[in-house]
Amino acid sequence: MMSGAAHSVRKGISCPTQDPNCTRIVESLSAWNDSVMSAYRLVDLPPTTTTTTSVAMVEESVYPFPTVDVPDHAHYTIGAVILTVGITGMLGNFLVIYAFSRSRTLRTPANLFIINLAITDFLMCATQAPIFFTTSMHKRWIFGEKGCELYAFCGALFGICSMITLMVIAVDRYFVITRPLASIGVLSQKRALLILLVAWVYSLGWSLPPFFGWSAYVPEGLLTSCTWDYMTFTPSVRAYTMLLFIFVFFIPLIVIIYCYFFIFRSIRTTNEAVGKINGDNKRDSMKRFQRLKNEWKMAKIALIVILMYVISWSPYSTVALTAFAGYSDFLTPYMNSVPAVIAKASAIHNPIIYAITHPKYRLAIAKYIPCLRLLLCVPKRDLHSFHSSLMSTRRSTVTSQSSDMSGRFRRTSTGKSRLSSASDSESGWTDTEADLSSMSSRPASRQVSCDISKDTAEMPDFKPCNSSSFKSKLKSHDSGIFEKSSSDVDDVSVAGIIQPDRTLTNAGDITDVPISRGAIGRIPSIVITSESSSLLPSVRPTYRISRSNVSTVGTNPARRDSRGGVQQGAAHLSNAAETPESGHIDNHRPQYL
């Protein structure tokens, strides 16, 4: 003990005489007065001075916080570990954020959860590791009381938000895999952002109470880091500790286990049903064997997700609950510091499990950071395919997607047109079912489709068309030439019989015009992307609507209508069939000039 220059606050703790602030701080740290005194006596410390001690000491210096007399190598070891965790975590999460910001194919609503997880882990490493490392090198807390509170608040906020985000990811995958049809179009970008906002507010709600007297932010372990006070054996502190672990640790853990259990069971049940449908030939046996491999891989990844969550936060929970139960005398400074380091290390494996193992993230990182291609084991063949897919997303393509229902015009049996719109984004499956990494879907596009249908009950002379219906795709190439191709297998087109004396204007209204009964009208779906290419010529759409006569603009650049006029255009889009009664069917489609 120091005599003369310091006065005793409690047994074994001393403060400088000229620093009255130390007395107030040490007295406020009741968590470290009684319980830590007994805990430190359990540590077998080698003699470092002529007078050996194993209790907290404060040297005559400008630092008001007490220190723990432990070997220097203990501080340096923890400092080196936390520095490694911080650098690795910041690099890994930065790669995930960078790949998301550069790649258009990754900007899906479901991937917003992965990005939020990367942001919280990055901020956790950025705010905790440098300060923890600095104080470990000084072997004491050097940033004052306000610095301790701010440090502990950031650790609590980002740590809680990370755990809640893990739960949100598990719930999102649960609905997509177990209820695929019901989940189509449900998760939009706006809803995903709203969910993340709720997660941040929820985390903030559990991080602010120590500022208002419910528990407190105090130094912990080797007194080189800070956290909330879980050592004080008072009703207020114990209530906060118990509620915090129920609503922040135990409930998310139960939800994660529940979701991944039913995800595994759903995929296993589906594979068994498919196996019963198929025969017992050699090919089906190979497929069954491959499904079993995928199931086992999925089970291992789900197990890793749960185990890493438990390993990261269970030690911290165990220490806090031990103090909550009144057995804080058994806790040593090392037992308080090591769980904090393990919890912060979760920022390393989260981006690996949820993002970097995903094929599209690896390809995006390898594309934009070529020096990491060999480290990520990305072959050049896959990289070229990924580059081609990126180029294809920058073209205006007419397509029909089962998961995209936005902007669809549908005509009811009463003859009225109705606009039905769905979610403005897509929710898709992952590239590999067994990967269980983030959901990936193609970037959503603004799609407009017009379907002309006719209730067969109103038309007694209806005869189905023998030719297969199709849709036209309008593809813009780098040369600026538009070409028309047949639709994919997934395209769904509706061809109906147009009622006599009725046709559609470009506004969707029904107008009376003389049209032959047997005419079949088809209007293709047009996908309009917001991105333009510098190689494409400027396109100005014009519309030509005729209420009296109906004309068809074919694929020829110039064609005479019923009145002898000539319709010209650089490119014309039409699927209508000519009829012997009238000249041609009206072209209610844009002409690109």
From Swiss-Prot:
* Keyword field: Cell membrane, Chromophore, Disulfide bond, G-protein coupled receptor, Membrane, Photoreceptor protein, Receptor, Retinal protein, Sensory transduction, Transducer, Transmembrane, Transmembrane helix
Membrane topology term: Multi-pass membrane protein
GO cellular component terms, A-Z: plasma membrane
Q: Which domain of life is it from?
A: Eukaryota
Q: Where is this region: Disordered?
A: 397-449, 547-593
Provide the membrane-side ranges marked Extracellular in the record. Answer: 1-77, 134-150, 213-243, 322-336
What the entry lists under InterPro entries is as follows: GPCR_opsins, GPCR_Rhodpsn, GPCR_Rhodpsn_7TM, Opsin, Retinal_BS
Tell me one GO molecular function of this protein: G protein-coupled photoreceptor activity
Compositional bias per record (Polar residues), positions renumbered to this chain: 414-449
Query: What protein does this entry describe?
Result: Melanopsin-A
Organism lineage string: Eukaryota, Metazoa, Chordata, Craniata, Vertebrata
